[in-house]
Amino acid sequence: MGNFINNAPFALVIVFLIIGFVLLIKGADFFVEGSSSVAKRLHVPSIIIGLTIVAMGTSLPETAVSVSASITGNNELAVSNVVGSNIFNLMVVIGVCAMIVTVNVAKETIKRDIPFSLICAGLLLILGILGVGDKSGMMLGHFDGVIFIGAFAGYIFYMIKIALKASKEGKKVEIEGGSDEDIKLISVPLSILFIVGGAAAIAVGGDITVDAASRIASDLGMSQTLIGLTIVSIGTSLPELVTSIVAARKNEVDMALGNAIGSNVFNILMVLGIASAISPISIITENIIDLCVLIVFTICVWIFAGTRKKIGRIEGFSMVVLYLIYAVYIIIR
């Protein structure tokens, strides 16, 4: 597929990029629906399904792109895809929601989730600079990937533990896709078809997206980092933006910030963990700068959220403006 895309007309490459996005997004939807149905048939608690299968499903497109980019040596794209998605989720998705309706912020998001996401971003920054486990430095190696995956497993275990405890105490536990009503029960053969077909679509979509993005970057004289931070990251995050806008219009965005922060944690620990465990990822100076921007933006949102326990229209507008300023910066740098 790579050779075909490299020799195809530019307009056709754009079409392939869109096809790649569709395969990634719909493949993730089918995979999550099939897996959730099987888990429900096996009597796995809905809370656990919501915290694992459903939550991780939103990061499957980024996983496929970064893993494919890492394997094919497109390291800049592997890292920038994750960092770009995190910045877009945080500043644009939440910012647009807040411009439509005030986003209430849970106490746990302020005291636990945002600080942990900062720790994850800081860990990525430190490991990238030090190149732990690799002589070349400025690299995420196999050992780094193991650290990330281990941290991710610990994070999931902790979240499941506190969610089950809260549920037993009769407290309301709000988790995306974490209720029986959210999980559709479909036949076993159809579930298997969804899982296998979804996984195949994700894998193929990841390869097509990486090949098309690399070709576009080459033809337009753009770096893979810029393509990853803009076109690819925005493309894989569009479903979250559309879903959040619809939810905002229905005034159902109380979980919006918590979901965005959770997705950002998954992107760093799971996506880059798997990608670097499979194949080492080189970290360039631009990646370090973008990570610093992510950390600064996260702190800004933390301040916005912690001040009044909510994010209003002014804060939301400020977040979108900050993203646009950042977008202009990465284009002209």
Predicted regions span which residues?
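Hydrophobic alpha-helical segments, chiefly the membrane-spanning helices
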Residues: 1-333
